[in-house]
Amino acid sequence: IVVLKDAASAAIYGAQSGAGGVVLVTTKKAKEGAPSLSYDATFGIRQAMNLIEPLNAEEQVKMRQLSYANAGLSLPAGWDTSKNPWVGTTRTDWMDEIFRTGFYQRHNVALNVGTENYSNRLSFAFDQDEGVLENTFDKHFTLRYNGKFKLNKWVTISEDLIWKNHEDRSVDTNSGYTGAVIAAMFMPASATVYNPLDGTYGGTTTEDPAYIAQYGSNFADAHGDAVNPMRLLEAHNRYDKTSEVWSTTSLEIANIVPGLKFTSRFTYSLEHQNYKNFSPIRDEVGKPELSNSLNNYSYRTDAWKTENTLTYDNTFNDKHTVGALFSTTADHYAMRGLEVDGKDFADESSYLQYLSYAGSTTAYDFLTGPDANVSLIGRLAYSYDDRYFLTASWRRDYAGRLPKDNNYGDFPALTAAWKISNEAFFPENDVVNLLKVRASWGRVGNLGSIGYNYKSAVLKKSSWSEQAQYGPESGKVWENFVYNGVALNPNLTWETSEQWDLGIDLDMFNNRLNVALDYFDKRTFNLIQEQTMNWPNTIGISGMLVNQGEIRNRGFEAQMSWKDKINKDWSYFVSGNFSYIKNKVSDIGVKNQDGTPGVWTGEGGFRNIPYIYQTAQGQPLNSFYLIKTDGIFQSDAEAAAYVKDGKRIQPDAVAGDLKFV
């Protein structure tokens, strides 16, 4: 695994690398040698650690009593154990109920057969994980073939073929009313997993008629609308299966002339997913759901990529090494899906949980893409006597999702290095084996903020009613209509990152100690984001994507590793790294009406605090904008004495309230 972080290294990979760098992964290949069969297996267990320890029933009652007393309110009857003794007895540790020890296993089998002219490798892997939450699992099957065939001394054909099948039953953990873990936090400890009267799932309190008759109520309102988490885990019938196929076919023609090689590669991938989730009626006390539903969707993704590359590498007079590359690439992506929701099933038996038994159904089809890109790539490299190194590259990308007049971008890069340790004046020694300084500059394009459907997202279909609020049609209601979903920007262009990097590489003590030091300065400009300023809500559609703003990231990275042998059979390797980065918005790109720099706002708010994160010029990206506090008031007297400019700024504050500054 190789990670390319600097823009000069990543530039040749284009917009697919985005602004974050490139990760290169080399997998196991077929090789020459006698036929071999290998097998390895791994077994283990998983447990969730550092779980929240919930209060027991007695502690919950005490907490409620204290909170109502501190607020000067009377205790509700549901939390008064003299009126509702049920609430004071612990019956369930909900965290213990929903979590378990999960068993996992891994199996890998590989067969390798190879000669001088051909090699084949076939492998099969099976992974299975029991989830740490009840009734969850994850299962993978992977079949892979890798073959290489040398037809003659010039022509080689290779094939990589992978089939993967993934099945899982995962669950939501933190959403209201459907998240099992958050439901376990809210469910009272006095409740039971199952109703002792009939074995159905228990609610927040008892449903025993004798108890209700004796105490006049089961006080269900005391616990709000909590949901039994075990019902969420066990009763919902989930099914999620994904099958994927990747194929890469390569043709290589070597030594067309000495040092010149041509490589053509075609990759195709196909992915299909089928998801099904049946949600039964939830009738226990707490948060009932009196209708059932079935969500079923499937999609198919097709993608292909072709690459044709000429490379030239040669050394002249044992000192001059020259390398050149020219490549063209093209890729295409499309995804088509169908989602059908059914509800009002008369019978919830598992063999009847199909859409044909639903009382009503609603269907949605969707298309992502098609998206296409074409690129031209060139690179020249020169080194002299393994001391001086210079590399220059250029890439032109054409992106189908950008407007026609701005759909291409040019991204150059330069790298220079000096291996000082190979100079004649550098003394031979056993301490410093390599000393190399390097510098690089490069630009990389990024389209990650633009969806595949950007240019085709003008029209959307509504499946709900909408009433006009403005204009001559005000008050009119439309059903199932087509409308403009987003405004397109004909001037949208590439988001671009430009980066400088200065580095030192140092190997010491017979190459056992390796040190790499880097300083970088990265400027990202023409950021692609939704326009949030000067976009009236009365337009009725989402803000258009625009290029605005500039972000600077400066920092330092240090990596250090040590490797050594204990004897001929044993060795060890230790590594560590340190990094420091400073991020700020150097240009916000928009101005207020008074000419001052504007602000980018995030989406929505939290508990009546609007736009809890914002981006302002001179500040880090997406900074939190919250109300500052200085602890809590320790007494009513302290709250009454808390003033600013002679006035109380929190006139209703009492002991225990937050102190705002």
Residue ranges and their predicted role:
Residues 16-21, 29-134, 172-175, 192-221, ...:
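Residues embedded in well-ordered regular secondary structure
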Residues 8-17, 47-51, 473, 491:
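N-terminal plug
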Residues 10-13, 130-134, 399-404, 425-426:
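A generic structural signal for short coil/turn motifs at secondary-structure boundaries
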Residues 14-19, 136-139, 173, 428-433:
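Short, glycine-/polar-rich solvent-exposed loops and beta-turns at beta-strand/coil boundaries
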Residues 105, 140-142, 146-165, 178, ...:
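Extracellular/periplasmic, surface-exposed regions of secreted and cell-surface proteins
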Residues 8-12, 30-33, 45-48, 131-132, ...:
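Short beta-strands and strand-coil junctions in structured, solvent-facing domains, enriched
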Residues 1-2, 22-25:
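Non-catalytic regulatory/gating segments with a bias toward low-complexity or hydrophobic composition
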Residues 38-86, 339, 453, 563-661:
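Conserved small-residue
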